[in-house]
Structures are given as C-alpha cells and as structure tokens.
Amino acid sequence: MSGYSSDRDRGRDRGFGAPRFGGSRAGPLSGKKFGNPGEKLVKKKWNLDELPKFEKNFYQEHPDLARRTAQEVETYRRSKEITVRGHNCPKPVLNFYEANFPANVMDVIARQNFTEPTAIQAQGWPVALSGLDMVGVAQTGSGKTLSYLLPAIVHINHQPFLERGDGPICLVLAPTRELAQQVQQVAAEYCRACRLKSTCIYGGAPKGPQIRDLERGVEICIATPGRLIDFLECGKTNLRRTTYLVLDEADRMLDMGFEPQIRKIVDQIRPDRQTLMWSATWPKEVRQLAEDFLKDYIHINIGALELSANHNILQIVDVCHDVEKDEKLIRLMEEIMSEKENKTIVFVETKRRCDELTRKMRRDGWPAMGIHGDKSQQERDWVLNEFKHGKAPILIATDVASRGLDVEDVKFVINYDYPNSSEDYIHRIGRTARSTKTGTAYTFFTPNNIKQVSDLISVLREANQAINPKLLQLVEDRGSGRSRGRGGMKDDRRDRYSAGKRGGFNTFRDRENYDRGYSSLLKRDFGAKTQNGVYSAANYTNGSFGSNFVSAGIQTSFRTGNPTGTYQNGYDSTQQYGSNVPNMHNGMNQQAYAYPATAAAPMIGYPMPTGYSQ
C-alpha cells in the first residue's frame, strides 16, 4: 500500500557528533526539591530564520476519500456526533486504509483487530497529518491516544535522524504517572514496528534509567510536567528538536495546577511546532490555553457540545445519608461479585477514606486494594497490575485514578463519595464502558452534595438516564431553603462524625458497633422498607436504584425510555459475604480469587507485599 516515505528509510547512520540545536550535556542532577519548579529555565528568544526548517504536512488524500461528496461527509459526521470548527478541515477517513499510514503501522493495527476508526480518529488523523494545530474534545475511552500517536510516527519519519545530544521530536505531556505509562505501552508496540524509540519519564521512579533513555536518544518522550522540568533544569534533555507537541488531558493538568509548569515547558519549544491538545471537557481555562499555544487550530468535538457522559453507561443514583453508604456498598458488592468478571472501581474523596475502606473491606473478605497519591510508584504499579489481571477485582481509588486509568473490562464504577464537580463525575464513570462496551455507574448522593445536584441532573438528562425523584426533591428543597432544615434530608447525626470524616466504616460500622448488632439493625430496616414499598419492584418514588430495573440482577436490561418511570429492585441475590468467604490467597504467584457457589469458612488474612499496610 502507499504510505509515507522519508530519508529514514535509507538507513542513515546515527552518529555521535556534537550536540545539535543547542543540546546540553550539563552536570549531575540538582538535589533541590523545593522552590518554584522551572525557575532555572530561561524563556527562549526564537529566531525562526535561524532554525532548521522541517516538514509537518504529509497528508495524502485517498482517492476513495476524494470521491466522497460533501453531503456524504456531513451525514457521517452527524451519525458520529462530530462537530468541527475552523477553516479547511479535511474530510474524515471512514476506513484505516484511507489514512495512508505506513505498512508497518497497518500491520500492528491488523494484529489488534480494530475494525474501523473511532470518531475522533476518523476526523483527527487527517487534521494531524496535515500539520495543523488541533483541539480534540471527546469522552474517555474514545481512542484519543492513537489519534495523536500514529500521526506522530509519520511526522517523525519525515524528520532528520536524532544525533547525540538531541532531545525528542515528539513530546507528550500527561497529568499523571498512570496515564503516561499507559500511553507508553501503546506507543511501544508501534515504535518497535517502526524502529523508533520512546520513553516514559515521571516522578516516583528512579531517575537513572530515565536519564539513560534520554541520553541514548528517543524520538517520542511521554512525560509528566514535574519530572520533565527537573530534567530540563539539570540539562539531561532539551526540547530544541521537538516539533510535535501533545497536551493529553489538558483539562486535568490544569485542575492539578500544572499550568505554570506547562507554560515553562512550552517556552522551551520552537513556536512553529505542531501542537495537539486533547481534553474531555472544554472549560474556559482550557480554551485560554488553546488560544495561547495553538495557531489557527481546528476544533473537533465528539458528542454533545456541553458537558456529557458516555451514553453506553447506565447511571444509577441513590440519594442517601453518609451513614447509610457502608451498608448500601456491601449489598451492592454482594450482587456485583456474584460474577467474577465484574471488575469494580470504588471512588472515594480522600486518601484517608481510601485506606479505611480498603482495610475494612479486606477484613470482611473482599478482594479489594486501594490506590491514591501517597502510595509509592512501585506499590501503585503492583496494585494496578493485580486489578487488571483480576487477582483483586475491587479497586478503591481517589481521583488520582479517575482519569487515564485504562482497563478495558471494568464493568462497574461506584461513587462512594460524590466528586467536587460534574467534570470529575464524568471522568470517574468513564472508567467503565470503554470503547463500544457498556457499563454501570452507581452513585451515593447525599444532602452534603446538594450544590452539585443541578449539574448532575443535567448530565443524567443529556444521557437519557432515569432521574431519581429524590434528586428532583433536593432541587426543590434547595430552592425553598429547606435542604438543611426540617423539610429536607438533614442528617441529624452529623455531630457524631469525627473530624475529617463523614460516615465510612469508622462511624456506625466500626468493629465494635458491628459486633453489637448494628448490621442486623440496618438489615431489618432494609427489610422493612422493602415490605413497605420503599425498595419495592412496583414503586420507586421513594426508592434507590434504576428505572425499569428488572429484578433479575444487575446484568439485566435497563430501559430508559421513561426517565421518571417505575424503578425495580435489582438486589435479588441472597448470597451473604462479610466474613463468610473461603480462604483466598493473592500475590504475584498465587491463583486468582475463587468465587464460591456457597458460603464457606472464614478466610485468613489477605496477604500483601512487604510494606503494604494491612
């Protein structure tokens, strides 16, 4: 097939001459850990006339694409909910061969059994291959990574070979270590096929191997802002050769406070570069960043122009009090874990809550592990590996894992604590229903979250989801000022919470109160509510989950044609977990968790690697 040829195909030798374009060979790493990151970096004063010229437009429109009429293009864009803004935007490619990627790239695509480009790939590839700046706004799991990596490979193949002292040609900035590593995993397979080198640099890991990769020369560098600035300041790499810049999850990087570091980094890159910015949302802060960094860019939006969730996700909201969450979570897990393939992520608000909930669930026999920002990189990698391979199918996480965590077969997301914004809510639930799969998201929504209720209802309505009548009641109560008074759902037990906690396993369901029979009290209360119709199949007006949620279990059909229709209870499982779980071992060399058909003897402690808190 036709592809992109370049002088790289002629096998030029990679010499070891003097550093080009101002490459640095500075001394050892600085030991300074505090202060203003990037304060040693001086903003470059670029003279484009003195810089080597480079190519960035390599797009060859396929004959099949050229014959496609404007009406056919518009029909395709409407069917895929593609909205384009900007001048001279190329037509979308409907098939992989229309992108004219090199044969070795097409071979990898064939091995991965992809059938057709996703919407963002179909429209993004022609734009990126044309050398244009672009902004891509699409939901999580939509194929954004390949949208910029494959054009990056074509771009690199048309540039001169790296020489000693040269920095990367393609720089991908990512907000978290996990996302950077996942991008590197995707890049590695394509780079091997194309005889290119890539590396991933991030904090929390030894600097030595990362420095050696940079010194040997890499065409693609995937980096978190902090570690990259560290290496730039001490001269271990430079960005003089960088002509293809990617800002992945730009909204998340701004949320995490990386804007000053991003600006310091971009100041080190020549201004005539090609820049691609990717985001799941389009707030004003991201718009401002695009105006500052991009020139005459094409804006591609997939899905609704406003804040929207993946329509393949069934969203179920339970309006409750904080002290009710633990019992509700256990009942949910009893139903979910009746199928061993049901990987589940439970999102919590704080690191402390993450540790507490993980310890309690493990003591009760659940195969759960926790991940948050205070974990070491080695421990985070180990936990994610256990989760991905099904050895610990329950992951309890803070928002550190809500973006960029790419595990294909996550079936359920549970928002134990509602996040601070609807954007974070959308990113959290986006961990399920990756690509074209479906998934389910449960959310515990309390009166403490009332400021978010209107935004949540908007997200649910946009996705054609059933809306819990209690959410609508909260809106009315908020408007009348009753949400904290007698007329609303005031939590009259807030004074019992310890400092920094709102419910959780360290309030009513701590070990002492649990042994005294509080669990039985809650179960009796739940049974009474069921008999009185609160959780009944016939009437959801005062209930918890689902719309027309057929009582054959969570995996059954859910019809959202009537957003205010009858709710039916999906908790028909009578299997009891808690301490009645068979012996289970976990570890790198142990077999996966065996899911019993019947209850068995109490389990022994769930073994962890050295240094992991029980």
From Swiss-Prot:
The modification Phosphoserine is found at residues 24, 480, 520. Residues 1-15, 488-498 have a biased composition (Basic and acidic residues). It catalyses: ATP + H2O = ADP + phosphate + H(+). Residues 477-614 are annotated as: Transactivation domain. SMART domains: DEXDc (SM00487), HELICc (SM00490), P68HR (SM01414). ATP binds at residues 114-116, 121, 138-145. There is a cross-link at residues 32, 45, 53, 340, 343, 388, 391, 411, 437, 451, 470, 523 (Glycyl lysine isopeptide (Lys-Gly) (interchain with G-Cter in SUMO2)). The modification N6-acetyllysine is found at residues 32-33, 40, 236. Arg-502 is dimethylated, probably to asymmetric dimethylarginine. InterPro entries: DEAD/DEAH_box_helicase_dom, Helicase_ATP-bd, Helicase_C-like, P-loop_NTPase, P68_rpt, RNA-helicase_DEAD-box_CS, RNA_helicase_DEAD_Q_motif. Residues 125-300 form the Helicase ATP-binding domain. Pfam families: DEAD, Helicase_C, P68HR. Residues 1-39, 477-504 are annotated as: Disordered. Its main location: nucleus. There is a cross-link at residue 53 (Glycyl lysine isopeptide (Lys-Gly) (interchain with G-Cter in SUMO1)). There is a cross-link at residue 53 (Glycyl lysine isopeptide (Lys-Gly) (interchain with G-Cter in SUMO)). Residues 328-475 form the Helicase C-terminal domain. GO terms for cellular component: catalytic step 2 spliceosome; cytoplasm; cytosol; extracellular exosome; membrane; nuclear speck; nucleolus; nucleoplasm. A motif (DEAD box) lies at residues 248-251. It comes from the Eukaryota. Its EC number is 3.6.4.13. Involved in the alternative regulation of pre-mRNA splicing; its RNA helicase activity is necessary for increasing tau exon 10 inclusion and occurs in a RBM4-dependent manner. Binds to the tau pre-mRNA in the stem-loop region downstream of exon 10. The rate of ATP hydrolysis is highly stimulated by single-stranded RNA. Involved in transcriptional regulation; the function is independent of the RNA helicase activity. Transcriptional coactivator for androgen receptor AR but probably not ESR1. Identified in the spliceosome C complex. Component of a ribonucleoprotein complex containing mRNAs and RNA-binding proteins including DDX5, HNRNPH2 and SRSF1 as well as splicing regulator ARVCF. Interacts with RBM4; the interaction occurs in an RNA-independent manner. Interacts with AGO1 and AGO2. Interacts with ESR1, AR, EP300, CREBBP, POLR2A, TP53, RUNX2 and HDAC1. Self-associates. Interacts with DDX17. Interacts with BRDT. The large PER complex involved in the repression of transcriptional termination is composed of at least PER2, CDK9, DDX5, DHX9, NCBP1 and POLR2A (active). This is Probable ATP-dependent RNA helicase DDX5. It comes from Homo sapiens. The lineage of its organism: Eukaryota, Metazoa, Chordata, Craniata, Vertebrata. The gene is DDX5.
